[in-house]
Amino acid sequence: MNAGPLTASTTADIDANVSEVFCSVQGEGPYVGVRQAFVRFTGCNLRCSYCDTPVGKEESCRFEEIPGSGVFSQPDNPLSVTDIARMVSSYGKIHSVSLTGGEPLMHAGFISGLELASPLYLESNMTLPQMAKRIKDKVSYVAGDVKLLPPSAVDDMDLHLENTIECFRTLKATRDRDCFCKVVVTKDTAADDVEGMIGAIAGYISCAVLQPVSQKELLPEPGYLLGLQERMLDHVNTRIIPQTHKMWGCL
Ligand SMILES: C[S@@+](CC[C@H](N)C(=O)[O-])C[C@H]1O[C@@H](n2cnc3c(N)ncnc32)[C@H](O)[C@@H]1O
Ligand SMILES: Nc1nc2[nH]cc(C(=O)O)c2c(=O)[nH]1
Ligand code: SF4
Ligand SMILES: [Mg+2]
């Protein structure tokens, strides 16, 4: 049994460093447009070259009390599970609570202690299988990224791929949980790599989403995305959905 530092302990953590809490609509993937509270944790175990999310401050969180106002209070970190429950319940009729980051699975101990009135929607890089095991019965939605990293970005590529597959196996779609995958596609994304990984996880997901990268200079040609979609359709229901929240300037 693996007993490394990222092996989950069995007790819940009562606090965590959170970079922001806000209310918006889900801007990515098949649930685009549903109203959500977003809880963005600090810290990440990866450094994706295209990442659009700055590393959050550890000292304080920013909390948008009125949705869309652009006005933030700055509660001190760490925040408790009770603080989070109070903040997200203030947002009214939400569909779910998006747990994002950074990498939320680095805070699995805290997530396992959350008791919220709304279902949990996990947004993860799917590379920490021990943490995934710990929270698998807490989350109702899993938006799992497939990270096709260049060899220079990982010490052990086989282990990275195994960890990804193990996360999807653990958090797979069931009667009580939806699980789908997103792949951020850039002009450097190799179709063979995408197809290999999607083939390996197809049995665990309800659909796959090809998400064009937001930086214009990194975008592939439209024909490339359509060709990739056609290949993926051999394995799983596949949609091309760009990030929508950036179109209308919401968080
Ligand atoms: C900021 S990440 C946080 C959650 C987790 N670490 C992950 O990567 O899934 C949230 C989502 O934004 C996507 N994303 C980040 N930068 C992007 C970009 N430049 N263009 C399109 N999607 C991007 C990620 O791939 C992921 O699906
Ligand atoms: N509106 C909106 N939708 C999102 N879906 C995933 C996001 C993320 O950064 O995890 C995100 C985000 O930051 N904003
Ligand atoms: S895993 Fe997610 S948060 Fe971390 S660097 Fe990649 S896109 Fe950004
Ligand atoms: Mg985002």
Predicted regions and their residues:
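Ferredoxin-like iron-sulfur electron-transfer modules
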Residues: 29-36
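Conserved AdoMet/S-adenosylmethionine-binding subsite of the radical SAM
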Residues: 94-96, 105-251
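Short, basic/aromatic-enriched C-terminal tail that caps enzymatic domains
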Residues: 2-22, 236-251
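Short aromatic-enriched loop/helix-cap "lid" or pocket-rim segments at secondary-structure transitions
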Residues: 30, 49-52, 155, 222
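Short, solvent-exposed loop/turn elements at beta->coil junctions and helix N-caps
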Residues: 24-28
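Conserved Radical SAM active-site core
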Residues: 2-4, 12, 16, 23, ...
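Cys/His-enriched microdomains
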Residues: 42-46
